[in-house]
From Swiss-Prot:
Domain of life of the source: Bacteria
Encoding gene (name): rpsH
GO molecular function terms noted in the UniProt entry: rRNA binding; structural constituent of ribosome
Protein name: Small ribosomal subunit protein uS8
Pfam family, one: Ribosomal_S8
Stretches assigned to coiled coil: none
Family: Belongs to the universal ribosomal protein uS8 family.
A single GO cellular-component term on record: ribonucleoprotein complex
PROSITE patterns in the cross-refs: RIBOSOMAL_S8
SUPFAM superfamilies: Ribosomal protein S8
Length: 132
């Protein structure tokens, strides 16, 4: 069965593993998922990630991050632009999550960027997800 929205599946697996306090989660690999994982790592939402060859294709293994008393680093994840309803934002109208405390992941002509990086570069694009 083909997957309609692999990014939503990726975010759902992260959300579920985070809710269950798992230390790591395995998802099917794709370049866009690896780029999203890199943004989450740079922003401090996950500890690390790596790619492994599985029996069928590659897998992306993400190590989740928790505080000293097991409080979650990721409070929420939300898919914004979906296959049935694409959401775009211009560089002057980039959305903010929790007044700038969260991160907006945007697909631009310069690759995947956070809202702050896109504003600094003056580019807009497709709003993929909110993370807080």
């Amino acid at each position: 069965m083909t997957m309609t929205d692999p990014i939503a599946d990726f975010l759902t697996r992260l959300r579920n593993a985070n809710s269950a306090y798992h230390d790591e989660v395995t998802v099917p690999h794709s370049n866009i998922k690896a780029n999203i994982a890199q943004i989450l790592k740079n922003e401090g939402y996950i500890r690390d990630f790596r790619t492994e060859d599985a029996r069928v294709g590659k897998s992306l293994i993400i190590q989740l991050k928790y505080g000293p008393s097991r409080e979650r680093s990721i409070a929420g994840l939300r898919r914004v632009s979906k296959p049935g309803l694409r959401v775009y934002a211009k560089s002057i109208n980039l959305p903010r999550v929790l007044g700038g405390l969260g991160v907006v992941i945007i697909s631009t002509s310069s690759g995947l960027l956070t809202d702050r990086q896109a504003a600094r570069q003056g580019v807009g694009g497709e709003v993929l997800a909110y993370v807080w």
